[in-house]
Amino acid sequence: MLYDDFYVKSLIQTIEDWPKQGISFRDITPIFSDPKGMRMVVDAYVHRYIATDITHIACIDARGFLIAAVLAYELQKPLILVRKKGKLPGKTISQKYALEYGEAELEIQEGAVKAGDEVLLFDDLIATGGTLLAAIELLTSQGASIKEVAAIIDLPDLGGSQKLRDSDIPVFSLCAYDGE
């Protein structure tokens, strides 16, 4: 199905002052309840990545899982879950990163990636880039290389996509919004 930017953007809701005052939250959940919109989004990524040399798709907890799982299925690639600390069973490898007030930690299962793996890293949204940069550090520490970061939404005013590009990581998003 051909991608229609206007249609997909019409599904994304803006919730003002959530999760805190002054933030315009971009809610992608209506895409998941709209089969046409979901198909457009998935097909846009399938067409972009079907003829590439990616070997794995990694995705960030939790909304990144929803599109990435379908994309991994469509492209027949292994899916790597990048989760918050304590959410994965078995042996894990972790990476700490700074938050606005404190620190958080991401994990992948030991052996999820190895040297030579070419990874597409997927998340629902690019904001400040902190979580994505931590996920990149985690995956590359195991020898994988990041081919591209993909997201449904980019908030370029928050600087995350530029930080990724400054780190020589290509970035692709379907929609961009100004402001927070």
Curated annotation (Swiss-Prot):
InterPro entries per the record?
Ade_phspho_trans, PRibTrfase_dom, PRTase-like, UPRTase/APRTase
What this protein catalyses is: AMP + diphosphate = 5-phospho-alpha-D-ribose 1-diphosphate + adenine
Its UniProt pathway annotation is: Purine metabolism; AMP biosynthesis via salvage pathway; AMP from adenine: step 1/1
Which major enzyme category is it? transferase
Pfam short name (any one): Pribosyltran
Disulfide pairings: none
Q: Where in the cell is it found?
A: Cytoplasm
Q: Which residues form a coiled coil?
A: none
GO CC, one annotated term: cytoplasm
Which CDD domains does the protein's record reference? PRTases_typeI
Q: What is its EC number?
A: 2.4.2.7
The UniProt entry's GO biological process terms, in alphabetical order, are: adenine salvage; AMP salvage; purine ribonucleoside salvage
Q: Which PROSITE patterns match?
A: PUR_PYR_PR_TRANSFER
Alphabetically sorted, this entry's keywords are: Cytoplasm, Glycosyltransferase, Purine salvage, Transferase
Task: List GO molecular-function terms, semicolon-separated.
Answer: adenine binding; adenine phosphoribosyltransferase activity; AMP binding
Q: Which family does it belong to?
A: Belongs to the purine/pyrimidine phosphoribosyltransferase family.
Q: What does this protein do?
A: Catalyzes a salvage reaction resulting in the formation of AMP, that is energically less costly than de novo synthesis.
Describe, as the record does, how this protein assembles with itself and its partners. Answer: Homodimer.
Q: What is this protein called?
A: Adenine phosphoribosyltransferase
The organism of origin for this protein: Marinomonas sp. (strain MWYL1)
